[in-house]
Design a protein with these regions (language model features):
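Residues within mature, well-folded domains
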Residues: 28, 49, 85-88
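Hydrophobic aliphatic residue packing
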Residues: 8, 22, 44-47, 63
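Ordered, soluble secondary-structure elements with a strong preference for glycine-centered loop motifs
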Residues: 2, 53-57
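C-terminal structural segments of small proteins and small subunits
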Residues: 57, 61-92
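N-terminal first-folded block
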Residues: 2-34
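Conserved interaction-surface patches within small, structured recognition/assembly domains
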Residues: 43-53, 76, 81
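A short, structured beta-strand/loop element
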Residues: 31-48
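A generic structural signal for short beta-strands and their flanking turns/coil linkers
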Residues: 16-18, 38-42, 74-78
Length: 92
């Protein structure tokens, strides 16, 4: 697990996730302009009751706001899938 992955996990703990998966996709983007600047590419799948009653856009904003201080320096690109526990049960 990378240091940035650990930082993402620590920050997202504020959302009290029931489940969180963080995938470092940076190696797939080697040579990409963002990779040269040090920011990595990450995918996050997060399940939290804090997403209940929120639109997909509001959920993404909540995740991005939580990770704001990591954006650009540590994170160049971020893919987010945010679910409530009930939605997660239906998917998995």
């Amino acid at each position: 697990m990378s240091d940035t992955t650990d930082l993402i996990r620590q920050k997202l703990a504020a959302l009290e996730p029931a489940k969180i998966d963080i995938i470092d996709d940076s190696a797939r983007h080697a040579g990409h302009a963002g990779a040269r600047g040090g920011g990595g590419h990450y995918s996050v799948i997060i399940v939290s009751s804090q997403f209940s009653g929120k639109t997909a856009l509001a959920r993404h904003r909540l995740v991005y706001d939580t990770l704001r201080e990591l954006m650009h320096k540590h994170i160049h690109a971020l893919s987010v899938k945010a679910y409530t526990p009930e939605e997660s049960d239906l998917i998995h």
